[in-house]
């Protein structure tokens, strides 16, 4: 294996795959994952709505295997900001040792990254809902204060003046809130654009890394074969 993919990482990957229920017995990972079906099942385990299993046909033929991986690349992996290069796919289809492990390890990282982003998004939504609930309670409080003021309490207040004050306060609060939301939305847009740029660069680097690792594996195996002769 390449230097970047040590034995400990390999074992962690196998342990991770073993925790996921798959439709076939786990025998030889290079052959088991060569047609892309189990890779699709693996992603579906974490993101059920992301994968439609009828698109992936169990296959022994190279043509069908390539078709499965092409669909998987386009419809699923791309949504995880991940793409497997064509020459790497060909090596997976040919059951080249050590290649599918590199892809699965990167896929595992992408799945974990998407899960983290999902949790962050859920937390932000919850915070926004909490803030909205707080604003609703404040509005009720203002109405309550308005109804409690009465001539019986010794204070004669012009109803038109009181109403005007209430509207002015509400308008100021609403303007401030809109301004804050606009600032947050602008910050979020800028952050999303930055993330997209970084993800594009990361995808390119990951593809280059996969290609390099596959090349190193090939050279290592050839060297070992020469040493045996």
From Swiss-Prot:
Microtubule-associated protein involved in the stabilization of microtubules along the axis of migration during radial intercalation. Promotes the establishment and stabilization of an axis of microtubules required for the active migration of cells into the outer epithelium. Microtubule-associated protein that promotes microtubule bundling and stabilizes microtubules against depolymerization in response to cold shock. Essential for ciliary central apparatus formation which requires both its microtubule-binding and bundling activities. It comes from Xenopus laevis (African clawed frog). GO terms for biological process: axonemal central apparatus assembly; cell migration; cilium movement; filopodium assembly; lamellipodium assembly; microtubule bundle formation; negative regulation of microtubule depolymerization; regulation of cytoskeleton organization. The Calponin-homology domain mediates its binding to microtubules. Residues 122-169 are annotated as: Disordered. It comes from the Eukaryota. This is Sperm flagellar protein 1. Transmembrane segments: none annotated. The gene is spef1. GO terms for cellular component: 9+2 motile cilium; apical plasma membrane; axonemal central apparatus; axoneme; basolateral plasma membrane; ciliary tip; filopodium; lamellipodium. It is found in: Cytoplasm, Cytoskeleton, Cilium axoneme; Apical cell membrane. Radial intercalation is a developmentally reiterated form of migration by which cells move in a direction orthogonal to the plane of the tissue from an inner layer to an outer layer. InterPro entries: CH_2, CH_dom, CH_dom_sf, Spermatogenesis_Ciliary_MAP. Disruption phenotype: Morpholino knockdown of the protein at the four cell stage results in loss of planar cell polarity protein asymmetry, defects in cilia polarity and affects microtubule asymmetry.
